[in-house]
Amino acid sequence: ALDFFKYWSVAPEFRGIGEKDVESALKVDITIEGDGWYADSTAKESYAIMGNIAYPISSYNLNFENYSDNRKKLLEAGVIINFPIGDLEISASREQLQYTDRSKNALLSKLKDIVDKLPDVLAGALADCKTYWDAKIIYNELFYHGGSLFALKDVIKKVGISYTDKNGKKWNMKHNHFDTSKYGKDI
């Protein structure tokens, strides 16, 4: 029952339950975030948040044409997406989304926007790294086996991300390694 409150912007006060249980149930671990969305490493699936209520997003109901669609891969990463009230239609039971054309278009449009901006968001996450090596460590922690964004590894392979060092040199990061063919001597 506590899971219902996990993504509320302000959690209610709970009585009759241990503080550690509440903390554990409401724990959100934001790995990366963009405008109106974030990846939560504790999420078992992706959710559309509308009016503090988390609605699971079904990739099946979005009718992706193929398994390798980047938007489908994004949903496998536990992405939490905020929507204004009324942008998505909900079922009569108010427990799930209705996958009408309007709701599907809103979801697909937002997913495309996130995928399009993902390289910039990820490059921003690496911007505070002092060295190439620090950036490589973070990159591998996120995208390597067991990393919180492992589901996005195929998306990253397609769109690519880069790290710019303090001297302005841009390092292209691909397939869990850096493009060292161009900069090998500078490592």
Map each language-model feature to its residues.
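GHKL/Histidine-kinase-like ATPase module
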Residues: 2-109, 115-116, 137-186
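Short, highly charged C-terminal tails/helix-capping segments
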Residues: 125-139
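Flexible helix-coil linker/hinge segments at domain or subdomain boundaries
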Residues: 112-126
